Amino acid sequence: MLSMSGPYTRLGAVLSALIVVFSIIGITMHRDFYAGRGRREFFCFYTNVSNLAVLLYFALAAQRLYTAESLHHLIPHAEFAVMMCIMLTHCVFHLILYPAVRSAVRDMPRTAAYRIVCTDNFIIHYLVPLSVLIYWLLCSPDKQALSPPDALYWTALPLLYAVLIFIRARFKGIIEEAGSPYPYPFLDISVFGAKRVLFICTRLYVLCVFAGLSIIAALHILK
């Protein structure tokens, strides 16, 4: 697992191990629950993409970054990007999608499927993001190395995801789980129109950059 240096050696190792375990459980539960529905569409959802990014970083990339001294300078930038990407998942779900999900789940019979849905949603939308946030706050080193461009760099993943989703919607058709060519209602051009969706995406992007800049500014003010 992760080789840590500095004052949070043991805590960092424990948290990184827990994050890997939580990510594996969340992704596995999600895939298994929908296994009979053709999971080629699994990564049409940003939630799954961001949880996979967390898993790949803490299970594979972090080990390389922390053990190769020549790569140490990349750690604060990589860990900030991973934290912001997964916190975007948490914020969009909690602030935008949760009311509709809660309404749908409330009417489900209290079966094993219901428990899986509730547990999985909690893991991938809350437990993993907040665990990564705690790790970043307590264990991620050299946060003072972050600068305003980092507020843009981390958005590469959600931007790439958005571009690929709109391309997919044009050529691939309906996502079975969503009942639409678009994975999330606020991206549905057929419902809101291209101008409205562009406005929503632009506003969300500006908020993402502003959040990144605010965090970086706070770090430098509090140093």
Regions found by a protein language model. Give the residues of each.
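Aromatic-rich, lipid-facing transmembrane alpha helices and their immediate juxtamembrane interface loops
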Residues: 1-223
